[in-house]
Amino acid sequence: MLNRSKMLQEIDNLLTSEGYKTSNIYDQGSFDLVARKNLLILLLKTFLNIDSINEANAHEMKQLANIFLASPIIIGEKSRNGILEEGVIYERYDIPAISFETLKNMILYKEYPEILADRGGYFVKVDGNVIKQYREEYSLSLKDLADLAHVSRATMYKYENEIVRANTETAMILEEILNTKVTLDIDLLKPTISEDIEYSNVEGADDLSKLGYGILSTNKSPFDAVAKMKSSKDKSSLLTNVEKNRSEKTLKRMAIPLKDLSMITSSEPVFIINNDKIKDSLGTIPVIKSWELKEFENPSELLKIIRERKDNM
């Protein structure tokens, strides 16, 4: 059995070998690793036992995935019910959880899992169009096919309209009757876009809201907040740390993950600082003073200053 540190290293090695850019490892936060390949971003969290994740951790992970247009995935070894099976998706708080072998199959071979483990057994998503097409080719009514598959007509109707999932046994029977594949692969690497982001107030960054940014405060991430325009086609975001009476030494240390994660997520990193003694940058991160933030009339002015200070380093 892998320990968690070894698992994280193997995940990092796997992704980099396939051309992904990976962040540093942040194993104390709501995510451990962020990886990017072209437009695809993965937000990954590892547990030896996937039941170790709590609701607050999962919620923050999902919120960040929505902001970054990323796919959140939990990778683990086991659950309370036993070892995670290869090719099976488990869910915890609506986040897919898989074994390392399942991740490896997706990354190396583009072999995506079909089976979902849920209360009551194993289920698959079925292709309703394929079922209907082949049923009609065989001149079977809904009831005919339902009887052959040992389900009700209403259930068969739901399969054809993709309202419900089928258990694996029923899917196998359908494939045998229709002589074709009816199950659907589940591409966990493809993000599920959701607008359900719970923006909040962040002390020291409230003036970003006046510029039209929605701000997501974080508790378990290597940055204080992430800000994104609420009503714009511009999908880029700001990764933000605020002063919070921290020493300059502490802030400089915090600049390292801020820079690292901004590069992977294509975000603009910025410190929002009250202390006038601190110059226009900390480490390699631009600094915006709180009083400056109050004076900006639109986000373009803010972004212009951030980029100018970045260029002047």
UniProtKB/Swiss-Prot annotation:
GO terms for molecular function: DNA binding; DNA-binding transcription factor activity. This is Putative HTH-type transcriptional regulatory protein Msm_0453. NCBIfam families: PRK04140.1. Residues 131-189 form the HTH cro/C1-type domain. SUPFAM superfamilies: lambda repressor-like DNA-binding domains. It comes from Methanobrevibacter smithii (strain ATCC 35061 / DSM 861 / OCM 144 / PS). Disulfide bonds: none annotated. PROSITE patterns: HTH_CROC1 (PS50943). HAMAP family: HTH_type_cro_C1. It comes from the Archaea. Keywords: DNA-binding, Transcription, Transcription regulation. Residues 142-161 bind DNA.
